[in-house]
Amino acid sequence: MQNFEIDYVEMYVENLEVAAFSWVDKYAFAVAGTSRSADHRSIALRQGQVTLVLTEPTSDRHPAAAYLQTHGDGVADIAMATSDVAAAYEAAVRAGAEAVRAPGQHSEAAVTTATIGGFGDVVHTLIQRDGTSAELPPGFTGSMDVTNHGKGDVDLLGIDHFAICLNAGDLGPTVEYYERALGFRQIFDEHIVVGAQAMNSTVVQSASGAVTLTLIEPDRNADPGQIDEFLKDHQGAGVQHIAFNSNDAVRAVKALSERGVEFLKTPGAYYDLLGERITLQTHSLDDLRATNVLADEDHGGQLFQIFTASTHPRHTIFFEVIERQGAGTFGSSNIKALYEAVELERTGQSEFGAARR
């Protein structure tokens, strides 16, 4: 079975300069390369091990044109590196994957690519590099040897996971597809209830552990919630957020906040109750409260996470900063803890249990 790692993430954008400026100015990414053809313009950005490609269509012939009309700016391609593109492509298509583009070599003779369908209209470009792994995406000119990324203690090291919203009823078939076509395995599964809302979630991961997809569908038997809202506003399945990992979430959030990134606010009651759930090992309660960073733990250790406020015109995609100190799960207890903390502040009750419905 083929092994996969993240090579780059491509987002389709309405305005290339505006989108690139935001990533460089607010998130401290650096421009690593550019690409242009008769139907598109692209910029490759780099920070840590993250390569982000932004593409603006210049012709209706480019698939970005139809994507943007339907969804607005968003993730269109999660490209994955593998040692044998032809074998991976053939196995995936044989197992039912949509064949988007057959394997072919680029002008860079050492690079072979192919493309298959993923979820919704998001695809996976498969990339085989016979040279160094630090090369630009195919078709780009420039240099990956950038020196100004990560400045100001932002330090986004890589991509921890993608959170993906699916239509109700599509979770099981999508999980089975990634297992069958790409050899992913399930590592986590849960049903989350938050008040009258509920969702089902399954996490699938490549054999190497380098590509992690958190797949989520709304529970048809519960009230509509944030997953339903995303599906409505995005007009279909798609990437809800990208989680960037950091060695120090508190420091990263301080640096990003100074650069103008807005994060979701956490009710003070959450921190009043946090000590009942967790004995903090890394960060102080005061630091977490000051930065709105959430904390959780599992049998492996602790994690610290925070979500940005969405700046998308449709309020769809947003981003996450996550620091793992041994934890292997995804902070699901924070969803319930935040809900109950909001209830405490809303009702003015002093006892945690009294806020439960």
UniProtKB/Swiss-Prot annotation:
It catalyses: 3-(4-hydroxyphenyl)pyruvate + O2 = (S)-4-hydroxymandelate + CO2. It is an enzyme of class 1 (oxidoreductase). Fe cation binds at residues 161, 241, 320. InterPro entries: 4OHPhenylPyrv_dOase, 4OHPhenylPyrv_dOase_C, 4OHPhenylPyrv_dOase_N, Glyas_Bleomycin-R_OHBP_Dase, Glyas_Fos-R_dOase_dom, VOC. Pfam families: Glyoxalase, Glyoxalase_5. The keyword Nucleotidyltransferase does not apply. GO terms for molecular function: 4-hydroxymandelate synthase activity; 4-hydroxyphenylpyruvate dioxygenase activity; iron ion binding. Binds 1 Fe cation per subunit. Gene3D superfamilies: 2,3-Dihydroxybiphenyl 1,2-Dioxygenase, domain 1. Its EC number is 1.13.11.46. Pathway: Antibiotic biosynthesis; vancomycin biosynthesis. GO terms for biological process: tyrosine catabolic process; vancomycin biosynthetic process. Substrate binds at residues 161, 201, 214, 241, 305. Monomer. This is 4-hydroxymandelate synthase. It comes from Amycolatopsis orientalis.
